[in-house]
Every structure is written in C-alpha cells, then in structure tokens.
A protein has these predicted regions:
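Short, glycine-biased loop/turn motifs at secondary-structure junctions and
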Residues: 1-130
Length: 131
C-alpha cells in the first residue's frame, strides 16, 4: 500500500492535496529532485511520521502516473497521484503488532496510538532511553 501523509489543511510545500486526482505541473524525472508529488509505502510510513510532526492523517495512494522510487530516502514521487478518503493515523496503527513495530522504530510514534497498552507505553519509553 502506498500512503500520502498529510497535515490538517492538506497543504504541503505549496501544493494543495484533495481526494481524487492530484497533478504536479512542475514534475521532473530526476530522482533527487523535489518537483513531484511525494509519498511512501506502508513499510516506511513510521519513518516519515516521525520526520513530519504536523501529520494528522493519511490518504491511500490508489493510483499514480510516472512514479520514480528514491530507495535511499524510502519514498516515491509521481507526476500524478489519485488519493483515497482521509483516514486517521491511528487506523494505520490498529493492531498490537503494528504498534509494537512503530514504537520500536521510534518511541515518539506513540503519539499516534489511541489508548496504548502498558506494554506499548513501556516499549516507547525504553526506545527513547527514558528507562
């Protein structure tokens, strides 16, 4: 699954995202170039959540055109992406196993988990070196 993380107003680097098709008018094919619509996958979403503290929700990228993968940064970019409905970050972390992986990668990910269990809380604190 491909995922676009977004803030409350869905405005990112001057581009206003919406449900449905979104197209970058300044797209460039260069993998190291910022010109394009960036997104990640479900295996790397936690890395990006912690780099983007204003994230409030996500949308699934249901299709894309002219995708380029940037393996070193764990992200993709495309000229055009079609986004699904707005979903709360907590939906992505809806199972104990997903929560455990998230806080093991970065204890700060706990802020996206609704009602974390004591074990998840302990893992998060331990990960951040507070225990």
């Amino acid at each position: 699954m491909y995922i676009k993380l977004l803030n409350e107003n869905e405005l990112h680097h001057g581009f206003q995202y919406t449900i449905g098709k979104n197209t970058c008018q300044d797209f460039r094919q260069d993998v190291n170039c910022n010109y394009g619509l960036h997104f990640t996958d479900n295996l790397n979403v936690i890395k990006w959540l912690n780099m983007c503290p204003n994230t409030t929700h996500f949308r699934e990228v249901v299709s894309f055109e002219n995708m380029i993968e940037n393996k070193s940064q764990h992200k993709y970019k495309a000229e055009s992406i079609t986004l699904g409905p707005k979903r709360d970050i907590s939906e992505f972390l809806d199972t104990f196993e997903k929560q455990k992986i998230a806080v093991t990668q970065d204890g700060q990910a706990i802020r996206y988990i609704q009602n974390p269990s004591f074990e998840i809380q302990k893992l998060a604190v331990t990960q951040d070196g507070l225990l």
